Design a protein with these regions (language model features):
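Bacterial N-terminal signal peptides that target proteins for export
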Residues: 1-8
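Extracytoplasmic
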Residues: 33-36, 59, 65-68, 88, ...
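Solvent-exposed loop/turn segments at secondary-structure junctions
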Residues: 82, 99-100, 124, 139, ...
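Surface-exposed, charged secondary-structure patches
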Residues: 103-145, 197-205
Length: 205
């Protein structure tokens, strides 16, 4: 099940790459276009399909990450404890949380081509700056799953700040574990926990 969720969240990452490219284009249209582009790249590039980590990371870095607001995601995941952190600690938390998400879901992005994605109509009032883009994802032998993206319109375009899989928020899932870590070991302990997890991923653990 965890593998499926990781694959779906990799799909969610893939669906956001071009959200800031054209302000007049609705976020759902941009999401659809970019999802198709990422799937096409994965299908055509044998190295990526084969799990070439260097190429996978390059794809994620160039097509996806610029359109996520990792600082806001980290702040939401850390929750009320964010205010306890110094500016330097906030920067460290954002850096390590970003690395955690990248490493976790880059490993699953090669599976995005296996899924069928249906994009739901977007109801966005004029002047709206916070939207929810909804999709339904399915795969042979698996019940359909809803993936929603929460996006905020910022000065430099639409930015994703949360992803929901079957109404389960990514930042909320992490908030529960982060709060537990802060209660036991403080902000510094949370940072060290993230550092260890990222080092373990780097070393193949």
């Amino acid at each position: 099940m965890l593998k499926i969720v990781k694959g779906l969240l990799a799909l969610a990452l893939a669906g956001t790459a071009a959200l800031a490219q054209a302000e007049m284009t609705p976020p759902d249209v941009l999401t659809k276009n970019t999802t198709n582009e990422v799937i096409r790249i994965v299908k055509q590039d044998k190295d990526i399909k084969g799990g070439n980590s260097k190429k996978v990371y390059a794809l994620v870095e160039s097509k996806i990450l610029p359109h996520f607001d990792f600082r806001q995601m980290t702040q939401l995941a850390v929750g009320k404890n964010w205010r306890q952190a110094t500016p330097e600690e906030q920067q460290q938390l954002t850096k390590e949380f970003r690395a955690l998400l990248v490493r976790t879901y880059s490993a699953a992005i090669t599976s995005v081509a296996d899924y069928k994605i249906e994009f739901k109509p977007l109801k966005m009032p004029a002047g709206e700056t916070d939207v929810l883009v909804s999709t339904e994802v399915s795969k042979s032998g698996m019940a359909p799953i809803t993936i929603d993206y929460r996006l905020e319109k910022q000065d430099n375009g639409w930015k994703v700040y949360d992803v929901l899989v079957d109404n389960v928020s990514l930042v909320t899932v992490y908030r529960n574990s982060f709060n537990s870590e802060v209660r036991k070991n403080g902000i510094a302990g949370l940072i060290q926990s993230l550092v260890r997890r990222n080092q373990s991923a780097t070393n193949g653990g």
